[in-house]
């Protein structure tokens, strides 16, 4: 658990050497959180789409450590959307699954497709199989299509595959595949590399990279087989995407993994559908006050409360070279999010440019502690403008171009000065001037 989620009793750390028993997930607490998250998602979608009040398919990004802290709230949400609940033994272990009857559920069963992280794949194979089992249970129910969207999709896909000559049993198994991720032993989502190397032209490039990295299916007897057709079919019906945040210790603008996994899913769905799905963030950082916001609202909240907060910036400035790198990493993350999901409006881009790159005092500080960080900030801002991710004012672009030329001169002067270069960390490009974190490679998601 996390101390910030009402679990102060876990402190001091170092006494407990396991997080939780995977066989107890989702826990009763996690179930209650998941049900509330699902209800809020459905209410939000219905309010935004009165002509089509129920989404056909919900795409859920599922990470490992958040589910350890929340007791499997993501899995609970997935099960509840499908109209299935866990059955617990008196010991707290989950012993099975139970169909929620239509009269109790009070709504259609929603199709759900989780995109799991590699840590989740490796740490919770029992939960992967649980979701897969729930899908097949719901697909087998003799219910009308309007009451059971998952079954309707499965039957349509089986008919399409058998018409192409695929064996009916094989077709049915493939039609019920819903859990997707990286290949066995693989990590990442394919998008971050393109953003960092600028090896992309449009959102479709990012979407295709995500599909290529994420089309490996998992379930009972299915261990990462390539199912691009099945993953694409889920994306085509994906009216809503969601990633839940269980803590405020970090957020969607904290590192590149967030846009890599979740922004990439939005880009992939947009590429296949031809229009963006509704994208949401479930906030259960305070389990007593769960909230759901659109991804754009969440990004705006974080930009205004943290990224543009003078107190936060001043706090990082106290850390000199490393603080400058962390400020620089903000731009790596912003361009990734806006390229994949269009979550940053032009006014906020302008404010970031003015605060981070064009403020004379900030420029002088960067030159003193880490000119490479400022170089990266301006480079990312210009890249965003040139790709029309940010429709920048021409005067702002001109200022950024002048700053870019000026900081390049500063870096050359420092690098060429033998009296400075050997004795300062500013004299040569750092290994990671942006100072960003890759939680996926660290095995933390």
Positions of PLM-derived features:
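Ligand/cofactor-recognition surfaces for anionic moieties
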Residues: 1-445
């Amino acid at each position: 658990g996390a101390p910030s989620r009402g679990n102060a009793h876990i402190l001091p750390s170092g006494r407990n050497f396991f997080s939780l028993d995977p066989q107890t997930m989702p826990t009763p607490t996690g179930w209650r959180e998941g049900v509330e998250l699902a209800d809020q998602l459905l209410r939000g979608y219905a309010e935004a789409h009165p002509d089509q009040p129920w989404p056909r398919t919900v795409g859920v990004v599922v990470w490992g450590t958040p589910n350890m802290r929340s007791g499997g709230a993501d899995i609970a949400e997935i099960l509840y959307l499908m109209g299935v609940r866990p059955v617990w033994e008196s010991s707290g272990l989950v012993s099975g699954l139970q169909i929620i009857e239509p009269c109790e559920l009070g709504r259609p069963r929603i199709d759900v497709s989780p995109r799991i992280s590699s840590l989740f794949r490796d740490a919770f194979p029992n939960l992967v199989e649980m979701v897969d089992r729930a899908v097949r249970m719901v697909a087998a129910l003799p219910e009308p299509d309007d009451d059971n969207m998952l079954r309707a999709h499965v039957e349509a896909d089986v008919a399409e595959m058998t018409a192409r000559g695929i064996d009916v049993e094989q077709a049915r198994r493939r039609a019920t595949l819903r859990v997707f991720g990286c290949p066995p032993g693989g990590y990442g989502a394919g998008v971050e590399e393109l953003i960092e190397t600028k090896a992309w032209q449009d959102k479709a490039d990012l979407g295709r990279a995500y599909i290529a990295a994420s089309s490996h299916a998992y379930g009972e007897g299915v261990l990462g087989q390539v199912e691009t057709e099945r993953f694409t079919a889920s994306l085509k019906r994906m009216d809503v995407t969601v990633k839940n945040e269980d803590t405020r210790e970090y957020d969607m603008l904290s590192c590149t993994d967030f846009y890599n996994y979740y922004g990439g899913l939005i880009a992939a769905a947009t590429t296949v559908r031809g229009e963006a799905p509704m994208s949401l963030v479930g906030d259960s950082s305070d389990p007593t006050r769960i909230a759901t916001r659109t991804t754009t609202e969440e990004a705006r909240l974080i930009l205004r409360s943290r990224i543009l907060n003078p107190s936060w910036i001043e706090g990082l400035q106290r850390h000199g070279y490393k603080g400058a790198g962390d400020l620089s990493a903000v731009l790596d993350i912003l361009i990734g999010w806006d390229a994949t999901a269009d979550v940053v409006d032009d006014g906020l881009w302008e404010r970031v440019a003015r605060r981070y790159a064009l403020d004379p005092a900030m420029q002088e500080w960067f030159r003193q502690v880490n000119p490479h960080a400022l170089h990266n900030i301006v480079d990312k801002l210009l890249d965003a403008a040139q790709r029309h991710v940010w429709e920048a004012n021409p005067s702002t672009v001109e200022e950024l171009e002048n700053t870019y030329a000026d900081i390049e001169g500063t870096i050359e002067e420092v690098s060429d000065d033998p009296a400075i270069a050997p004795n300062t960390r500013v004299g040569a490009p750092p290994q990671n001037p942006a100072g960003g974190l890759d939680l996926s490679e660290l095995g933390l998601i």
